[in-house]
Regions:
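GHKL/Bergerat-fold ATPase module in large chromosome/replication-associated machines
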Residues: 58-177
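GHKL-type ATPase core
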Residues: 1-77, 83
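Short, well-ordered loop/turn elements at secondary-structure boundaries
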Residues: 15-16, 49-51, 110-112, 176-178
Length: 178
């Protein structure tokens, strides 16, 4: 929407956080009715992607018998680790390794931070969820291609170093690890 006024300081407070109210502007948005379930899914996802923050959805369109509006909060202390666990659990996939593999790092020179959480499960198919700046990159991208290549390279190097592939009669490929 259009800002009503510039950001202004209101004074000191012992409260923290940001409160956002959203009312779609009919002159900007063609669709101004949103499904609560869609919003809940996105806010739940954001809570996993930003561990430690609480996001609350209040839907003033829906009130209970006491005129209290519908409200639901989303919070994740474990972040993307919990996200991977939830995705596997909701899909009925069983983890082959008891703990989610988690790696994070930041390049101080480029100021690029990366978080990776992965789980090997009993599903035949690969399920990759990738995000850049909290936006789901559904179609992948160079970051996903680079991750797949690196994962393959690391596993192949480890397997060769540990002589795990000596009896294999075929070339081990990336799909064998994914």
């Amino acid at each position: 929407g259009i800002p009503q006024y510039p950001v202004r300081e209101k004074g000191e407070s012992d409260r923290t956080g940001t409160k956002v109210h959203f009312w779609p502007d009919h002159s900007i948005f063609t669709a101004t009715v949103y499904k609560k379930e869609t919003l809940e899914g996105r806010l739940r996802e954001l809570a996993y992607l930003n561990k430690g923050i609480r996001i609350t959805l209040t839907d003033l369109r829906e009130v209970d018998e006491s005129s209290v509006p519908y409200s639901k909060s989303f919070f994740s202390q474990g972040g993307i680790i919990e996200f991977v666990e939830m995705l596997d659990q909701n899909a009925g996939r069983n983890a082959l390794i008891p703990r989610v593999i988690y790696v994070e790092g930041k390049d101080d020179h480029t100021n690029v931070a990366v978080e990776v959480a992965l789980s090997y499960n009993d599903s035949y198919n690969e399920h990759i969820y990738s995000y850049v700046n909290n936006i789901n990159t559904i179609e992948g991208g160079t970051h996903v291609s680079g991750f797949r290549r690196s994962l393959t390279r690391v596993f192949k190097h480890y397997g060769e170093r540990e002589h795990l592939f000596e009896k294999a009669k075929v070339e081990i490929e990336g799909d064998d690890f994914r």
